[in-house]
Swiss-Prot record:
Sn-glycerol 3-phosphate binds at residues 14, 84-85, 137, 247. Signal peptide: none annotated. ADP binds at residues 14, 18, 269, 312, 413, 417. It comes from Psychromonas ingrahamii (strain DSM 17664 / CCUG 51855 / 37). This is Glycerol kinase. Pfam families: FGGY_C, FGGY_N. It catalyses: glycerol + ATP = sn-glycerol 3-phosphate + ADP + H(+). Glycerol binds at residues 84-85, 137, 247-248. Pathway: Polyol metabolism; glycerol degradation via glycerol kinase pathway; sn-glycerol 3-phosphate from glycerol: step 1/1. The gene is glpK.
Length: 507
């Protein structure tokens, strides 16, 4: 055990940058957060300014240490967790990005993916070697788009002048004064360029997409010292950066789901269900991803993942675009003012459908509207859609793995909504466990960093600190459960291939 007092987790998310300080008992001492701008150049396109990502992340770190009067020599290590797949390409010499960060939600490369699907055997090769599906969601086609569309980028890349990184790589490179170009297995596994069998960059895929190997970062485990940073505050001590994991894998680790068959769902902007499958690579036949997660010591292990693109973002849509809510937190109050959704289903496929459908051309739909439907029914149906989408993924996961979950661990902003959690339990017919500490993603990053530097000796030491705040048990009528879910499946069919079939109608 070290005599340092604190661990810091940096959580660079889709809408905000956060810093979380933990003490040796894994208690949260303080949290600091700054939001940043979402950029929408065209319909279906989503970008961030990479310099703003770094500026907000470094600002919250400096801010939180100053606020708590904590010196850098009191920090044992920093762990980083980040929005995954989001793609940044920058100049190795100047450090300036050649284009905005293309965000995981961005669908601009759908046509590139369609063209690649014409290559015989390529989809199967990608599935077998990266564990992913050929979809705009992942980094590979985003890098290709930048190299193909930014003037001079392809030439500079071929000359070895450009670097690629997911957000973790960009932050570490900046925080170490441009000395360390590194990523971890969990983030690498989300690029569609990393071979999860050999644990190396896949040179065949790099060649197909026209991406030079020189752009790619060194790939390491999720729990080791990658470099040092002097950003943070007074004390004069450089702080080790000792943990990196993509946000969903960090949450899985924060829940201590490190053994085969343990699973969690994170309800954030999107919803992400992960099940650890240990050393066994399970290839999905139900539209799920095979990805890399963290074993007990931060080493690479395998997991199944299902991604729902619109989770909490659908509630933001009710608030910001539909003006049905003043505050997202009010959704529970209005949803419980009615006894049911009155036959209404909302399918929030605003940017396509993720697992298990993988339809980039699906678009959002409200079905079952009658004269008796009011705003409360639509709010309730939107909340219910989050639970139904989770059921879609969990059914596929259990079919692939052969494991029936006894309980689902949950985290993320929406888990504070008791209506949603109870409905989730009812829809799944499974126990839902909500932990006392909501910052599970930050916990995972902190645990990985702390274990790397000896701040904590083992996961067993941490296990006693985990507390379940509330357990939700299913109590829905089995016949009604089946009927409701059948209605959901019919509603999903109404959304599929909409943009592909109807785009010309809007020209």
């Amino acid at each position: 055990m070290t005599d340092k007092k604190y661990i810091v987790a940096l959580d660079q998310g889709t809408t905000s940058s956060r810093a979380v300080i933990l003490d040796h008992d894994a208690n949260i001492v303080s949290v600091s957060q700054r939001e940043f701008k979402q950029i929408y150049p065209q319909a279906g396109w989503v970008e961030h300014d990479p310099m703003e990502l770094y500026a907000t992340q470094s600002a919250v770190l400096t801010e939180i240490l100053a606020k708590e009067s904590i010196r850098s020599d009191q920090i044992a290590a920093i762990g980083i967790t980040n929005q995954r797949e989001t793609t940044i390409v920058w100049n190795r010499e100047t450090g300036i990005p050649v284009y905005n960060a293309i965000v995981w939600q961005c669908r601009r490369t759908a046509s590139i993916c369609d063209a690649l699907k014409e290559q015989p055997g390529l989809e199967d090769y990608i599935r077998e070697n990266t564990g992913l599906v050929l979809d705009p969601y992942f980094s590979g086609t985003k890098i290709k788009w930048i190299l193909d569309n930014v003037e001079g980028a392809r030439e500079d890349a071929e000359a070895g002048k450009l670097m690629f990184g997911t957000v973790d790589t960009w932050l570490v490179w900046k925080m170490t004064q441009r000395h360390v170009h590194v990523t971890d297995y969990t983030n690498a596994s989300r690029t569609m360029l990393f071979n999860i069998n050999t644990l190396k960059w896949d040179e065949k895929l790099l060649k197909i997409l026209g991406i030079p190997l020189s752009m790619m970062a060194e790939v390491k485990s999720s729990s080791e010292v990658y470099g040092q940073t002097n950003i943070g505050g007074v004390g004069g001590t450089r702080i080790p950066i000792a943990g990196i994991a993509g946000d969903q894998q960090a949450a899985l680790y924060g829940h201590m789901c490190v053994e085969k068959g343990q699973a969690k769902n994170t309800y954030g902007t999107g919803c992400f269900l992960l099940m650890n499958t240990g050393k066994e690579k399970v290839t999905s036949s139900n539209g799920l991803l095979t990805t890399l997660a963290c074993g007990p010591k931060g080493e690479a292990s395998y997991a199944l993942e299902g991604a729902v693109f619109m989770g909490g973002a659908s509630i933001q849509w009710l608030r910001d675009e539909m003006k049905l809510l003043a505050d997202a937190k009010d959704s529970e109050y209005f949803a419980t003012k009615v006894d049911s959704s009155n036959g209404v289903y909302v399918v929030p496929a605003f940017t396509g459908l993720g697992a298990p459908y993988w339809d980039p051309y699906a678009r959002g739909t409200i079905v079952g509207l009658t004269r008796g439907v009011n705003s409360n029914h639509i709010i309730r149906a939107t909340l219910e859609s989050i639970a139904y989408q989770t059921r879609d993924v969990l059914d596929a996961m259990q079919a692939d793995s052969g494991i029936k979950l006894s309980a689902l661990r949950v985290d993320g902003g929406a888990v504070a909504n008791n209506f949603l959690m109870q409905f989730q339990s009812d829809v799944l017919d499974t126990t839902v466990q909500r932990p006392a500490v909501s910052e599970v993603t930050a916990l995972g990053a902190a645990y990985l960093a702390g274990l790397a530097v000896g701040y904590w000796e083992s996961l067993e030491e941490l296990a006693g600190k985990a507390v379940i705040e509330q357990t939700f048990e299913p109590h829905a009528d089995p016949v009604k459960r089946k009927q409701r879910y059948r209605g959901w499946k019919r509603a999903v069919k109404c959304t599929q291939a909409w943009a592909e079939m109807h785009d010309e109608d809007f020209e």
